[in-house]
Amino acid sequence: MRQSSAYKFCKKNQQVLPAKRRQPGKFIGGTTLKNNSITERLLDASRPIWEGYLSHPFVRGIADGSLAVEKFRFYLLQDYLYLFDYARVFAYGVVKARDPDLMRTFSANVDAILGGEMKVHRAYMERLGITEEQVFSVQPALSNLSYTHYMLSCAAAGGPAEIIAAILSCSWSYAEIGTRLAAIPGAADHPFYGEWIRSYAGEDYQKTNDALVALMDQLAEGCTETEYRRLEEIFVACSRYELGFWEMAWTLER
């Protein structure tokens, strides 16, 4: 299996170091970024796309409670299927990592998705009368398939740095959306959508995302400009896929 140049250069950074207190910088989703960090550069490269998340009618509908339940149901089913492949991308990290602590980090995230984030989905599925068997009878939308196949291909061809670059736009953008929506008076108290907002704005989710942001900076430390460009390419592409996912749910894409 071919390893990308970014992995070959950055593999020396696979050892997981103790978390350090991060210096003040730009804020997004509650995360503090170090000035001139890799993640700050990745965010700047994708900022026009990210602005589209918060202005998208699907996200606005969650914020003000006006989103049709039919659209949310479609999103819920597609996102539940997506999360299995999302967990598989993390699982590639267990295989690619050479440091035991990094292996544990990737493994812990697989558990967090399957046992943690999916709990929110299952709670909504119960409210909507959806069984897991019904979920697996649903065909993934083309936008969903394209997104997950791209992430999995990046994970298969690359190393830990590429894997986190592929994963991060999802985790980070949900942290941002959750934080922004929770700041809207009354949004987190909505009888139906409030639970969704609270889950992504919550401390546990935010801490998990912060750890992934820090890991991205650690794995990419010392990369050349060419190697950084590959990480940027992956992150921006996945950011575009994220925006497409919201549009897929809004239009009930078949």
Label each residue range with its predicted role.
Residues 15, 21-32:
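Short, Lys/Arg-enriched N-terminal segments with co-localized hydrophobic residues
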Residues 230-254:
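Acidic, carboxylate-rich catalytic segments that either coordinate divalent cations
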